[in-house]
Swiss-Prot record:
GO terms for molecular function: amino acid binding; aspartate carbamoyltransferase activity. Belongs to the aspartate/ornithine carbamoyltransferase superfamily. ATCase family. It catalyses: carbamoyl phosphate + L-aspartate = N-carbamoyl-L-aspartate + phosphate + H(+). Pathway: Pyrimidine metabolism; UMP biosynthesis via de novo pathway; (S)-dihydroorotate from bicarbonate: step 2/3. Coiled coil: none annotated. Catalyzes the condensation of carbamoyl phosphate and aspartate to form carbamoyl aspartate and inorganic phosphate, the committed step in the de novo pyrimidine nucleotide biosynthesis pathway. Heterododecamer (2C3:3R2) of six catalytic PyrB chains organized as two trimers (C3), and six regulatory PyrI chains organized as three dimers (R2). PANTHER family: ASPARTATE CARBAMOYLTRANSFERASE (PTHR45753:SF6), ORNITHINE CARBAMOYLTRANSFERASE, MITOCHONDRIAL (PTHR45753). This is Aspartate carbamoyltransferase catalytic subunit. The gene is pyrB. Pfam families: OTCace, OTCace_N. It comes from Clostridium botulinum (strain Loch Maree / Type A3). The keyword Transferase applies.
Amino acid sequence: MLKGRNLLDPMDFSLEELEGVFKLADEIIESPEKFLHVCDGKILATLFYEPSTRTRFSFEAAMLRLGGQVIGFSEPNSSSVAKGESVADTIRTVGCYADIAAMRHPKEGAPAIAAMYSEIPVINAGDGSHQHPTQTLTDLLTIRSLKGDLSNLTIGCCGDLKFGRTVHSLVKALSRYKNNKFVFMSPEELKIPDYIRKEILEKNNIEYKEVSKMEDAMAELDILYMTRVQRERFFNEDDYVRLKDSYILDGEKMKYAKKDMMVLHPLPRVNEIAYEIDQDPRGCYFKQAKYGMYVRMALIAKLLGVR
């Protein structure tokens, strides 16, 4: 049972619990009309201390499609945070009004602090460059639905691997499934963090390699996970400008890829995926966005104990 639990890290749920979420998402996709009222009378609080379009809209759409309601803020200046209120006090107050909360915060660990003081389930909707577990659930459901399995895959991660919280969460999650291998493609300044390399991959004897050119790895990939270079993570604008166009996926590079490779992206994109790829059936990132709403519907229903 996931009722009353928090989701702060993709490792919080066992593989069996994750599969339960995915199976419920499958049911929702198959028969959404059966779930129109399962959250009647329930309220989701969206506490977004950082800008977001897709994640926030996805959570809100998920709750509304379950029959629930949504309260919250989309940037801290519109809340008591601007007056200096702590995360602990905010979540305790919000818990008086809502049944479940989704929090995005620029500081790593902020949702975990909120969960310590909260009497309602807290979902980490992204904390700094640390974790983004509901994006990971989205990614896993997309791969599972389109590939049929989450094992025996070669996954390429490309772009900003240092600050990209979606990559960190995805590598941790897919490392739990059998016989997965990773290929990391990034500029030297944006390489995968040591803690992922040492504590997740090497500690568990998971095969990985790092390459400097996308073309060197494309032919072996089952999944290509693209990310943007995030301007908001840079203190120096010159560094951002120098690195932002480091890796761009276009039709020429796709010629090296398998016919059934999947291209995923957590969105928003800037220019790291050429628009011509949108017409390629291997470009699955907009399907991925839709799966995100369904998996959040399933997660909310599970944490509230209504399914």
